[in-house]
């Protein structure tokens, strides 16, 4: 089921009255299984939504690009070299003007439990102005790279991705 007609989605009548997506001629989606949901949520006629894959992920199949992103990560966080990289990328909470990130992640416990095989890199949503602080003594293990690398860069580097309802899970 799409978000149309749900408590937080638009009604079919509203979508008819205000066709936000009425000027679209093509919409690309990741697979045939999700075409119906986009047609319903965007109130589009059949044939506009096509399963071609998502062009935004094309770069993830370019080995040179991926390797260059990893090298960029190692320049910023040398501790990541030869370790599994966990990307922690939650979406924002609240309203755009006061957006926040979850602040209950226990980096100390992650460090203790995972040992020397892993590092965590954090990427907060661009709306978040004051992300949680990672203690200085854990910077060898966990680092907030929001200001230094794009989400695309970090997706190339990640062996594991921890997120929530952020749309980036469709790209990973």
Model regions: which residues?
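Nucleotide-activated donor-binding/catalytic signature segment of Leloir-type glycosyltransferases, i.e.
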Residues: 128-147
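Active-site and donor-binding regions of nucleotide-sugar-utilizing enzymes
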Residues: 1-67
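Short active-site oxyanion
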Residues: 22-27, 119, 157-160
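Helix N-cap/beta->alpha junction signal
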Residues: 30-33, 124-126, 165
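Tryptophan-centric aromatic hotspots in well-structured domains and transmembrane helices
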Residues: 42-43, 88, 92, 147, ...
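Acidic, amphipathic alpha-helical patches
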Residues: 17, 107, 150-151
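A donor-sugar binding/catalytic signature common to diverse glycosyltransferases
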Residues: 148-172
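Conserved catalytic-core segment of nucleotide-activated headgroup transferases in glycan assembly
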Residues: 52-134
């Amino acid at each position: 089921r799409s978000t149309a007609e749900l408590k937080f989605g638009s009604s079919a009548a509203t979508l008819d009255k205000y066709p936000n997506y009425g000027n679209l001629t093509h919409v690309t989606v990741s697979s045939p299984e999700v075409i119906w949901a986009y047609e319903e949520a965007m109130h589009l006629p059949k044939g506009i939504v096509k399963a071609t894959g998502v062009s935004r992920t094309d770069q993830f199949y370019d080995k040179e690009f991926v390797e260059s992103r990893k090298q960029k990560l190692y320049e910023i966080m040398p501790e990541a070299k030869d370790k599994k990289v966990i990307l922690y990328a939650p979406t924002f909470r609240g309203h755009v003007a006061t957006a926040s990130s979850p602040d209950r992640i226990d980096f100390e416990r992650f460090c203790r439990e995972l040992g020397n095989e892993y590092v965590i890199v954090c990427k907060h949503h661009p709306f978040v102005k004051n992300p949680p602080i990672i203690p200085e003594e854990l910077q060898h293990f966990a680092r907030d790279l929001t200001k230094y690398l794009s989400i695309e860069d970090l997706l190339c580097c990640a062996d594991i991705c921890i997120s929530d309802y952020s749309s980036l899970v469709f790209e990973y």
